[in-house]
């Protein structure tokens, strides 16, 4: 996953190198170390389901585990690559990270097509297909292993390993054991917005933005009480127990 994120970041910077005319090479290189924490968090989130399947694979010998992991990896690659190339496509127009608002445009795909240059759109579609195919092939050839047949299996080994790895993945997800979880600000380091955008993990940002938006449920996040209750409080604040106006005229009308 780290290679996936780094390569995607390189592609993004190359596509929008025209927006970096006055930025030094060394400042651009700072993007990668500042991106590490969010990349680690995202990698842990994406790796969590595989930890479950690998643990089950060690406990139960079944050839179907590898098929499940291949399908799961393909689904993840499709989603994460779509987010990556979607951001590359709209960044020139939006100049901000891809957010949940992109899903609203899916209701009218013509707006998306009109926003992105035709040549760039074709390149992005080809790049998307090649990206997914390359990383799926890499996973199948290098990462995934043949079905494990436990020999001299210890009933204690798998649970302990699972607990240790689960704890490490949990720590990676939230960016450590500090009171405050990791956020986008962890990657900000430059006065150039595009470098900060490049450092923030695209997939982490999109998913966090989408989940945060769904929790709001189109409601006002600053509304702490009902309108009726607020009006009653205002009436009490402005109410006067007696008229304290100084009478200057004899006529009280």
Can you say where each PLM-predicted feature lies in the sequence?
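Transmembrane and membrane-interface helices of multi-pass
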Residues: 1-216
């Amino acid at each position: 996953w780290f290679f996936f994120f780094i390569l995607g970041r390189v592609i993004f910077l190359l596509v929008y190198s025209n927006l970096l005319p006055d930025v030094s090479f060394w400042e651009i290189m700072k993007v990668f170390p500042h991106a590490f924490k969010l990349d680690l968090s995202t990698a842990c989130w994406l790796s969590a389901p595989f930890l479950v399947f690998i643990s089950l694979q060690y406990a139960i010998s079944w050839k179907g585990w590898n098929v499940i992991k291949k399908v799961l990896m393909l689904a993840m690659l499709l989603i994460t690559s779509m987010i990556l190339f979607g951001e590359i496509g709209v960044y020139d127009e939006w100049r901000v990270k891809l957010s949940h608002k992109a899903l609203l445009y899916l209701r009218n795909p013509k707006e998306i097509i009109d926003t992105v240059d035709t040549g760039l759109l074709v390149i992005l579609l080809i790049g998307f297909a090649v990206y997914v195919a390359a990383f799926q092939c890499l996973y199948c050839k290098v990462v995934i292993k043949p079905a494990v047949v436990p020999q001299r299996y210890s009933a204690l080994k798998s649970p302990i390993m699972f607990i240790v790895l689960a704890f490490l993945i949990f720590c990676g997800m939230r960016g450590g054991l500090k009171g405050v979880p990791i956020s986008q600000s962890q990657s900000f380091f430059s006065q150039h917005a595009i470098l900060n955008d490049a450092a923030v993990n695209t997939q982490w940002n999109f998913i966090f933005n989408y989940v945060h938006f769904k929790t709001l449920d189109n409601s006002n996040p600053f509304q702490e009480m009902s309108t009726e209750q607020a009006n009653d409080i205002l009436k009490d604040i402005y109410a006067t127990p007696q008229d304290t106006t100084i009478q200057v005229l004899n006529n009280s009308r």
